[in-house]
Amino acid sequence: MIYSTEVSNMAGV
Protein backbone atom coordinates (compact mmCIF):
# COMPACT_ATOMS: atom_id res chain seq x y z
CA MET A 1 0.00 0.00 0.00
CA ILE A 2 1.22 3.50 -0.83
CA TYR A 3 -1.10 5.12 1.72
CA SER A 4 1.40 4.89 4.57
CA THR A 5 4.15 6.26 2.34
CA GLU A 6 1.97 9.17 1.24
CA VAL A 7 0.99 10.03 4.81
CA SER A 8 4.59 9.81 6.00
CA ASN A 9 5.75 11.96 3.09
CA MET A 10 3.04 14.49 3.84
CA ALA A 11 4.07 14.57 7.50
CA GLY A 12 7.67 15.04 6.38
CA VAL A 13 8.89 11.90 8.09
From Swiss-Prot:
Q: Which domain of life is it from?
A: Bacteria
- Other facts: On the 2D-gel the determined pI of this unknown protein is: 5.6, its MW is: 29.5 kDa.
> What is the protein name for this chain?
Unknown protein CP 41 from 2D-PAGE
State the organism of origin: Clostridium pasteurianum
Kindly list the organism's lineage. Bacteria, Bacillati, Bacillota, Clostridia, Eubacteriales
